[in-house]
Amino acid sequence: MKKVFLLTAAVLLQTTSLWAEVLRGKVVDASSGEDIIGATVIIKGTPDNWAITGLDGSFALETDLSSGTLICNLIGYKDAEMQFNSATGEMTILMEQDVVMLDAAVITATGSGRTEVAARSIERNSVNVVNVMSAKAMELSPDITVANVIKRMSGVTVERNSSGEGQYAILRGMDKRYNYTLVNGIKIPSPDNKNRFVPLDIFPSEILDRIEVTKSLTADMEGDGIGGAVNLVMKDAPEKMEISANLSTGYSALFIDRDFQSFNYRAIQPLSPNERMGRPELHNQNYSVSADDFTMENLHMKWSRPRPDIVGGFSYGDRFFGGRLGVMAAFSYQNLFRGKDASLYYIPGSAGKGTENRAYSDEQNRMGAHVKLDYRFSGRHKLMLYAGYMDLRESEVRDGYNDQERTVRMKWNHQYIFNTTLKGEHSFLRADRLKLDWTGVFSKAYSTTPDNARIYINGDHLYNTDSADRRWEHNSDRDIAGYVNISYRFDFAANSTLDLKAGGMYRDKVRNSFFNEYTFDSPTGIYDLQIYGQDWTNFDELLLEPRRFGNVGDPLNYDAFERIGAAYLMGVYNWDRLEVIAGLRVEHTDQGYTLVFPRQTDGEGHQVYTDLLPSVHLKYGIHRNAFLRFSYGRSINRPGFFEIVPYTILNEDYDEQGNPDLKHTVADNLDLRYEFFPKSSEQFMIGLFWKKLHDPIEYGLISEGQATYLTPMNFGDAVNAGVEVDIMKYFNWFGIKANYTYTHSSITTTKRAMDGTEVIAVTQTRPLYGQAAHVANLSLLFKFAKAGVEAQVSGSYTGRRLSEISNWVDNDIWEAGYVQLDASVEKSFKCGITIFAKANNLLDMPVLRYIVNNPRTENLNGYERYKGGVIERREWHGQSAMIGLRYSFKEK
C-alpha cells in the first residue's frame, strides 16, 4: 500500500512539473529592433506573476498556465500583448514607441540621453567621433561631481586640485588647455584668473542629462579644441510630469583618525585695504596701511571632527498648454568635507630640512541650479530659454611642518558660472527642407579669494621678519555671443540626400583681474619673540605689523579682451551606407590686454590672426550594426589671457616672464575608428588617433643678459598619437564596461644643465605635460531587475605621467601609476523610492611622485627611492562613503 501511495505521489508531482513552464523571450523596439531594458512583463490575470527585462532585454517568467497572454509595458512605449501556449518557444515581443502629436509634429516620449540605450544611440548616429555618458550611468556611478564622473570615459583623465579632488579634464593626454567646455552646446567662460579652461568640479553631476566628449570637430563647432570638447547637456522638459528628489549623507575616513582644521572665514573682509580706500594709487595718492586695516578674527583656527557630508537635490519637469510649454527646473546642493595627508621627502632646489608633513582640510559647498523652458509654436517653430548657475565655495587649511618650521595657509575661495541662452529653431518648406536656428548668449564667470593668509613659524615662535603674508585676488570673465545656422536638404534618387549648412558666430569677451598682497613682520622684535604656548595659542592672537605699502602693482592687475568671429560652410551627404561630412571654418581672433601698472614695457598689446580650419568625416556602415569612421580636421589653441602679458614675477629659484610674442598652436588631427553595436546598449570600439601640433605652447627657459626666465614658448612641432578601446557587454543580470587608452607624445624643450661649474641651456625630449601613456577603466555591473537591485564595482588605472616640469634636465617630477577602486549599490521599490550607497577610494592607494635618477639626485643620501629615483612626496586621500534616499515620480 505504501509503495502504491509513493508511486501515485511521484506521478502527480511529475505531472505538475510538466505544466510548471518557464517562459523565455526578449522585448525589442518595433522600429529599431533594439533590445529594451527595464520593461515589465506580466501574465494577464495574474498580476503577482511578473518579470523585468534584464540588461540584454531578456526575461524569464515561471508559470503553471498552459496558455495565456503576456502584457509588456514601459514608460515611453505603448503596451504590447502576445499570446503563448505550451508549444511556444522563445518569444520576441515588439513594443512601439509612444508619441505625442502636436500640429503635425511628432515628439517621442523618451529622454534624449538619460538612458544607456539613448547614449549608445547618440554615439551610433553622430557624424563625428564622440563618447557619451548617460544620466543613468552617472546616477549609478560612485561619483557625484562631473570632474570625477568623466574620468571613467574612454581617453579621459583628470587633474586634481590641492585637496586631491578631480578638477580639470585631460583628453587623450592633451593638457587641459587643449580642450574646451560647453553647456548645452555653448562655450562658457572660466573663473580662472590666468587661463581659459573651466574647472569641472563646480558642476554637480545629478543635474545633467548626459556628458558628451567630442574628439573630432566638425565645421559647425568652435575650432579651439585640439584635444576635444566636453559638452554638459542639462536635463530637458519631459513629455509628462516628472519629479525627483534625493538626500544623502556620508563621511570621509580621513577624519576618523585626525581632526578637521577650519578657520573663521565668515569674518573675512571681502575687499582689501587698498580697495576700501578707493584704490588711491590710481590717483597718485598715499595708500599706506597699518594693523588696524586688517582683521584678525578670521585667523582663529578650530580643530574638531567634521559634520557628516550632506548632498541633496530636487528636479521638476512637465508640459503645459497642451504640451506646447515645457518646464524643467533642477537644484542640487553639496556640503562635503575632504582633505589629504601628504609627506614631502625631497623638494628640488631647496636645502634639506627633513620630511615636511602637510595636512589639508577642505570644506566644499557646491550648488547648481538651472531652468530650461521651451515653447512649441507649432511643429516647425520652437523657442528655448536656459538659465544655469553653478556655485562653489571652498574653505581650505593647509598645515605644513617639519622639524624646523611650520607654514599654515588659510584660504577661502568663491567662484561661480552663470549662463543664460535664448535659442530658436525654425523649419520651412515641404518636409522641413529648410532649417534655421539662432542663439543669443550671456555668460559670466567670477572668482574671488579674499584674505588668503599664510603664517610662518620658526620652531616654537613666529618668524621675526616675513612673518605672514595676506593677499586679495578676484577676477571676472564676461561673454556676449551670438550664433546662427541655416541648412537646406536636397533629396536625390537612390535614397541619397545632401544637407548644405552654413552659419557663423561672434563672441565678445571682457575679462579683468585684481591682485593685492601685503607682507607682515613681528612688531616685538628679535629680542622679544612671540612664542607658542606662552604669547599665543591661536593664530588670531599673534601680533602682526604690515609693511606700509602692499604690492598693488602686480601684473595680475590687468584687463583683457577677446573678440572672435567665425563663419563656416559644411555639407552632409548620405547615400546608402555612406555618410560624408566636409566643411571649412574660418575663425578670426583679436585678443589683447591692458596692464593697470605697466613696468617699463608697453602697457597694452594684442594679437590678431585668422585661421582656415578644414575638416572631413567619413562614416561607412559595414553592416547594420557596425561602422567605420575616418576624420581629418584642423584645430587651434589660443594662448592664455595672462601668458601674452609682459609680466615678470620674481621667484626663489628662477623668475617667470610673460611672452607677448607667443603664437597660437595649430594642429592637424586624424582619427580612424571601428564601431560595433551588437545590441542597443552594447558596443565595441577601437580607434586610432594622430595629432601633429605646430607651435605647441609649453614652458621653457630663456636667457636675457645675466638673467634666466621661465616663460611660455612655442617649441616647433609635437606629435601625439594613440589607440582607444571601448567595450560594453551585458547579459541578463550582469554587465561589463571597460576602456583602455594608450597615448604616446613627444616634444623638445629647453632645460638647464651643469657643464662643470657653468650652467648651460640644452634641449630635451619628453611627453606632453599631464599625459599618462596607459589609462584603463573597468566596471562590473549587476542588475537584479525583479528585486530592484543594481550594483557597480569600478576600478581605474592611470599610468605614470608627467606631474611637474622642472627647468633642469631629467629633474621633472613624475606621478607613479595609480589604481582606484569604487563601488555603489541601490535598491528600488515600486513606490518610487530608492535606497543607495556609494563608496570611493576603497584601496586608499597613495599618490606617489618621484624624480628619475639623474646627476642632481644620484648622490643624495637618506632619501627613499622608487625605481632608482628619489621619492618627492606621497599623498593619502582616505576612503569616503555615502548613503541616501532617492524618490522618482513619472506620470503615466
Named regions from a protein language model:
Residues 689-692, 711-805:
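Gram-negative outer-membrane beta-barrel transporters
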Residues 797-804, 827-892:
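C-terminal beta-signal and adjacent terminal beta-strands/loops
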Residues 60-62, 158, 186-215, 235, ...:
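Short acidic/polar hinge/loop motifs at secondary-structure boundaries
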Residues 93, 202-244:
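A beta-strand signature from Gram-negative outer-membrane beta-barrel systems
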Residues 28, 39-44, 73-77, 90-139, ...:
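Short, acidic, small-residue-rich periplasmic hinge/interaction motif at the N-terminus
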Residues 295-398, 418-420, 616:
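Transmembrane beta-barrel wall of Gram-negative outer-membrane proteins
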Residues 187, 393, 446-449, 510-512, ...:
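Surface-exposed extracellular loop regions of Gram-negative outer-membrane beta-barrel proteins
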Residues 405-423, 552-565, 636-693, 703-730, ...:
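Outer-membrane beta-barrel signature, preferentially recognizing the C-terminal barrel domain
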